[in-house]
């Protein structure tokens, strides 16, 4: 029996109440059965109590069986006393009933699968054997032996038949019933069909018993119709109800079966032929559907065989014992055997002995369910006895009951790859020996997979044990903190400029500080991007010590030489120039001879901005800002200008006296140019080069702020393309992108210079028309819509047509709230699309009312969803992008069901709340269900769970206290409970957050994205994780702005000692990009599919956390 089948299906919180309910059910069915016994036999002709006990034993753990037997027996005895006298009680019969129930339950557990006991006809035959044949026969024998009577054969037959009929009528229903089956009848169609079928079956069965000959033949036809029409559960319920009604009619009037219906037979003598044909026709159609399904399965198997046979890599079906069941041509060519020869061998016989044990360990994990698939590099013997390398990928096919059937193996030839690796290794050994003789360490950095490779000398230089895997963090921690920023900048600049670099820095070693000189060159890929860096490290400590001695003798020379790549100007105490290097001469336009003795600000024409005021005091620059952010411009005397950043260093004598200063000026023109490009990317759509939503909303806010002062009227237009998705689906995304660019140019050509056109997302556009009335706005919008409707887009020789709809709202003194005008334009646009597309609609108040009626969810329905409807907790696995298999943290999202059965996600549901109490109530239910149903299992698995906590819940001291009380009373360690809190709420509710952290909970700040102002107030002890906004991560692999923002957030997180979480991540390329940035954790489909929390904790295996 599988582990799953060993779990107890039912575990009620009140067992005593459940036993009482069983006793009451047994009492009712016993009363019914005993009523039937009053028309002719001492034994009941139809007996249900034994079947009730049998089902109860089957569905409950063995420790509850005594209680079940006692409660059901008391129900039987009570029914007997109610109908008969106390003296008529026969405890022997009750004991026999218990023996039959125990035997039947044991047999059913052995013969049937646990989760779905009745899957096919074979299962039903095993059910009949275990409940309707063996137990009744055993009971009949015991009755004859223990209570002998005048006619033992009659007693035996009545007992066996009554028990068998009761078992076949009740046991299937009892085995199939599950509480969630009742939820299916929320579907009105299924409920109506079930009730109608029940009513028709009972009515026609009643009429058959009263007026038709051979009534049971008619009833058989009716029950077959019910079986074909309805699902199993409903069909077995109708069978039980029909049996009870017919038996009750027979008990009330035994003469029903003896009365011939001569009148009907005289008028319809051929009626039996109809009864012969109906079941045959029904079964013919059922078998036809079954054969069609078998044909479909056969076709699928044929497709699989063809795909396997003609695959370019080796594929095989392998038995659970290792025998080759089926192989394709590629595998046969790789191993040198024919298919017939491989069938006589096992993979163990062909595997290199050193790889066999590792392979078998993975096979055991696969069979036990610990893993779903595995891959490894392994060696095989081919027919000639040679060892060949292969990349093996294996998955397991299981039977519906979970039994392993066979393995699917993919075996790819990597022999040439291994030979190349061996050649490269030998070459590397020769290079290493040569460099060891010269004391030079060689390193390589592959950028995309982020892999570092060091030779032996590198480990010796950094005094790092050879078993430690080198990476950026290992190297970065070795660098002296004072040199880290400069080193990182040099490397980043080299990568951006795709040029070699030379870098000198210091590292910390056991004996103190070691000076390192690094030289590196880049290797470009086919696209011209840097693929990897190759470089050397040299120990320059002795040279540096000598240089330090020379620099101490002449500090001015030290500073000048150290800054030789930048403009260097020396001044005396009177601010007059005493030295200028060539770079300074070039940037200022003055030669050193001309500048000597001239005041500094006469030579250096520095302004704040390109056309800003002159700098009057060289010490007035904002040193708190970075080099790029300081908007300082140096104007050359001969023309031209430079964006610069400068620093001033005082010059001192040996006794500390100040003798002047050294001014170092850096040319940051390119850096500021990049910053401007990033600023442009942040405010413009990358595809159409129109303003994006953020820029559009900013322009709208500026326009709204001037309405009261200028008393002008403006127009806001929303434009939505029609049939764009059809072009995108039929011609491809490239065509869709080209169409958007062409339409953007078309619309832009029809606007004034002061108008603002923006792409809001997808196929939606926004248009701001300053100083424009409704009539003019309607005219402009109509022109645009007509132009779009008439536009012919040609792609790959085909003409595509799209349309557009527009909604207009007027902005004036009485209507200048951003959210309202955006909503009005959206509602007007919706009215245009709803009115037939290709239209222009001006907003009217009644449109908003109609839109609200369609979209709003009533408050009562929201409360009912929170309090009564089903709630599902979905778990999303979180792991490091560098080790995606290691998951020990799970983010929880919520799915709710509306009263119509529609699934609504948590964020959409919360956005519809008009009362903060709804968020508070939803939080309370989430925590209650988690601690009641999942906390114990989560604690036993040792995994960390992150639950959402809204701002309303966080602001409630009562809810926070209740949460901590539930946590204290549960077996869950507080460190395993993570709470997801919106980032903007952390400062306003710092006291509640600190209270949760002191209790041991971990805090996850969500919605961390484009607003970086929060980091000005965020402290290191406020939270543990930063959950990045999902939109920020979606296209990070192709969006430089998003990549820069995530890099900034990652830097802040490292500074604060927090970890970053990004997602959802769907593409491996996005995972690689986030890994390269240094993001700590990610979630999404590349890590694991989301699954219900109860399934996660009940069916998964975890390491000890």
UniProtKB/Swiss-Prot annotation:
- Which annotated residues bind substrate? 728, 733, 737, 783
Task: Provide the protein's localization.
Answer: Cell inner membrane
Q: Which factors induce or repress this protein, as stated in its UniProt record?
A: Expressed during transition into stationary phase, expression is equal at 28 and 37 degrees Celsius. Expression is RpoS dependent.
**Mind listing the GO molecular function terms for this protein?**
diguanylate cyclase activity; GTP binding; metal ion binding
List each copy of the GGDEF domain by range: 712-845
- Residues at the site labelled Transition state stabilizer: 725
What EC number(s) are associated with this protein in UniProt? Answer: 2.7.7.65
Q: How is the cofactor bound?
A: Binds 1 Mg(2+) ion per monomer.
A GO cellular component annotation in the UniProt record: plasma membrane
Co-factor(s):
Mg(2+)
Question: What's in the keyword line of the UniProt record?
Answer: Cell inner membrane, Cell membrane, GTP-binding, Magnesium, Membrane, Metal-binding, Nucleotide-binding, Repeat, Transferase, Transmembrane, Transmembrane helix
Q: Which PANTHER family match?
A: BIOFILM ARCHITECTURE MAINTENANCE PROTEIN MBAA, DIGUANYLATE CYCLASE DGCP
Which NCBIfam families does the record cross-reference, listed alphabetically? Answer: GGDEF (TIGR00254), PRK09776.1 (NF007298), sensory_box (TIGR00229)
Per UniProt, subunit arrangement is: Homodimer.
Name the job this protein performs: Catalyzes the synthesis of cyclic-di-GMP (c-di-GMP) via the condensation of 2 GTP molecules. Involved in the control of the switch from cell motility to adhesion via regulation of cellular levels of c-di-GMP. Part of a signaling cascade that regulates curli biosynthesis. The cascade is composed of two c-di-GMP control modules, in which c-di-GMP controlled by the DgcE/PdeH pair (module I) regulates the activity of the DgcM/PdeR pair (module II), which in turn regulates activity of the transcription factor MlrA and expression of the master biofilm regulator csgD.
Stated name of the protein: Probable diguanylate cyclase DgcE
Q: What organism does the record attribute this protein to?
A: Escherichia coli (strain K12)
Which gene is this protein's source? dgcE
């Amino acid at each position: 029996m599988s582990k799953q089948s060993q779990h107890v299906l039912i575990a009620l919180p009140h067992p005593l109440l459940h036993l009482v309910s069983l006793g009451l059910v047994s009492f009712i069915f016993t009363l019914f059965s005993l009523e039937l016994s009053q028309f002719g036999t001492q034994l009941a002709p139809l007996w249900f109590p034994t079947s009730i006990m049998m089902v109860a034993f089957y569905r409950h753990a063995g420790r509850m069986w005594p209680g079940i037997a006692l409660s059901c027996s008391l129900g039987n005895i009570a029914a007997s006393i109610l109908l008969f006298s106390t003296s008529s009680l026969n405890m022997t019969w009750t004991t026999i009933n218990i023996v039959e129930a125990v035997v039947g339950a044991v047999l059913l557990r052995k013969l049937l699968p646990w989760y779905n006991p009745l899957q096919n006809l074979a299962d039903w035959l095993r059910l009949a054997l275990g409940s309707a044949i063996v137990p009744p026969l055993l009971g009949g024998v015991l009755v004859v032996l223990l209570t002998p009577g005048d006619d033992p054969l009659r007693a035996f037959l009545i007992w066996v038949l009554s028990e068998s009929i009761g078992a076949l009528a009740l046991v299937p229903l009892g085995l199939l019933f599950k509480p969630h089956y009742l939820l299916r009848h929320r579907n009105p169609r299924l409920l109506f069909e079930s009730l109608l079928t029940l009513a028709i079956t009972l009515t026609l069965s009643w009429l058959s018993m009263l007026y038709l000959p051979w009534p049971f033949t008619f009833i058989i036809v009716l029950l077959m119709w019910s079986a074909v029409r309805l699902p199993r559960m409903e069909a077995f319920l109708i069978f039980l109800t029909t049996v009870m009604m017919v038996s009750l009619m027979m008990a009330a009037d035994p003469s029903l079966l003896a009365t011939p219906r001569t009148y009907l037979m005289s008028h319809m003598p051929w009626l039996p032929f109809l009864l012969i044909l109906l079941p045959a026709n029904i079964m013919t159609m059922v078998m036809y559907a079954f054969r069609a399904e078998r044909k479909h399965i056969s076709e699928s198997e044929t497709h699989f065989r063809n795909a396997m046979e003609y695959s370019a890599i080796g594929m095989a079906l392998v038995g659970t014992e290792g025998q080759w069941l089926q192989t394709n041509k590629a595998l046969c060519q790789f191993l040198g055997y024919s298919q017939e020869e491989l069938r006589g061998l096992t993979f163990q016989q062909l595997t290199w002995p050193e790889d066999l044990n590792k392979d078998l360990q993975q096979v055991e994990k696969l069979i036990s369910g610990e893993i779903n698939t595995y891959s490894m590099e392994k060696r095989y013997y081919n027919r000639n006895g040679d060892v060949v390398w292969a990349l093996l990928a294996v998955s397991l096919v299981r039977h519906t009951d979970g039994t392993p059937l066979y393995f699917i193996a993919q075996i790819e030839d990597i022999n040439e790859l291994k030979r190349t690796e061996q050649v490269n290794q030998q070459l590397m050994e020769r290079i290493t020996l040569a460099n060891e003789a010269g004391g030079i360490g060689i390193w390589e950095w592959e950028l995309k997979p982020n892999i570092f490779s060091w030779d032996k000398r590198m480990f010796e230089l950094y005094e790092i044990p050879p078993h430690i895997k080198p990476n950026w963090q290992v190297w970065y921690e070795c660098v002296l903190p004072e040199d880290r920023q400069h080193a990182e900048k040099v490397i980043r600049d080299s990568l951006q400029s795709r040029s070699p670099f030379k870098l000198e820095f210091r590292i910390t070693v056991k004996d103190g500080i070691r000076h390192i000189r690094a030289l590196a060159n880049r290797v470009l890929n086919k696209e011209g991007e840097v693929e990897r860096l190759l470089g050397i490290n040299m120990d320059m400590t002795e040279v540096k010590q000598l240089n330090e001695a020379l620099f101490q003798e002449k500090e001015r020379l030290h500073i000048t030489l150290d800054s030789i790549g930048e403009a260097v100007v020396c001044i005396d105490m009177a601010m007059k120039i005493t030295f200028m290097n060539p770079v300074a001469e070039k940037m200022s336009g003055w030669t050193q001879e001309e500048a000597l003795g001239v005041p500094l600000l006469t030579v250096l024409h520095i302004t704040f901005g390109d056309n800003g005021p002159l700098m009057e005091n060289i010490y007035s620059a904002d040193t708190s800002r970075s080099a790029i952010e300081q908007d300082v411009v140096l104007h050359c005397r001969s023309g031209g200008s430079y964006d610069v950043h400068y620093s001033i260093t005082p010059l001192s004598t040996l006794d500390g006296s100040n003798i002047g200063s050294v001014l170092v000026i850096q040319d940051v023109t390119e850096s500021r140019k990049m910053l401007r490009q990033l600023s442009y990317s942040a405010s413009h759509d990358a595809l159409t080069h129109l303003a994006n939503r953020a820029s559009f909303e900013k322009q709208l806010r500026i326009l709204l702020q001037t309405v009261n002062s200028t008393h002008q009227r403006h127009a806001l237009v929303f434009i939505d393309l029609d049939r764009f998705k059809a072009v995108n689906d039929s011609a491809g995304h490239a065509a869709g992108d080209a169409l958007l660019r062409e339409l953007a140019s078309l619309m832009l050509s029809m606007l004034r210079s002061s108008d603002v056109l923006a792409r809001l997302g997808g196929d939606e556009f926004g248009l701001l028309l300053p100083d424009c009335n409704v009539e003019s706005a309607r005219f402009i919008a109509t022109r645009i819509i007509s132009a779009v409707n008439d536009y012919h887009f040609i792609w790959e020789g085909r003409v595509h047509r799209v349309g557009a709809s527009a909604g207009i709202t007027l902005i004036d003194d009485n209507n200048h709230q951003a959210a309202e005008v955006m909503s009005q334009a959206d509602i007007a646009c919706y009215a245009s699309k709803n009115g037939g597309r290709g239209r222009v609609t001006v907003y009217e108040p009644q449109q908003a009312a109609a839109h609200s009626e369609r979209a709003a969810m009533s408050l009562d329905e929201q409360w009912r969803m929170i309090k009564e409807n089903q709630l599902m907790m979905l778990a999303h696995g979180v792991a490091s992008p560098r080790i995606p298999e290691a998951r020990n943290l799970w983010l929880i999202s919520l799915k709710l069901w509306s009263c119509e059965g529609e699934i609504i996600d948590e964020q959409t549901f919360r956005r519809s709340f008009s009362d903060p109490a709804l968020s508070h109530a939803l939080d309370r239910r989430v925590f209650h269900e988690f601690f009641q149903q999942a906390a114990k299992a989560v604690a036993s698995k040792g995994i960390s769970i992150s639950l959402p906590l809204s701002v309303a819940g966080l602001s409630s001291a009562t809810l926070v206290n209740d949460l901590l009380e539930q946590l204290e009373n549960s077996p869950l360690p507080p460190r395993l409970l993570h709470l997801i809190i919106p980032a903007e709420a952390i400062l306003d509710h710092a006291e509640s957050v600190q209270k949760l952290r002191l209790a041991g909970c971990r805090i996850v700040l969500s919605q961390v994205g484009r607003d970086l102002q929060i980091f000005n107030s965020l402290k290191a002890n406020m939270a543990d994780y930063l959950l990045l906004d999902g939109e920020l991560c979606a296209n990070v692999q192709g969006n430089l702005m998003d990549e820069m923002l995530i890099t900034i957030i990652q830097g802040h997180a490292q500074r604060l000692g927090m970890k970053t979480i990004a997602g959802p991540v769907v593409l491996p390329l996005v995972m690689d990009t986030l890994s390269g940035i240094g993001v700590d954790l990610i979630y999404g489909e590349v890590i694991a599919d989301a699954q219900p929390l109860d399934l996660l904790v009940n069916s998964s295996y975890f390491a000890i956390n």
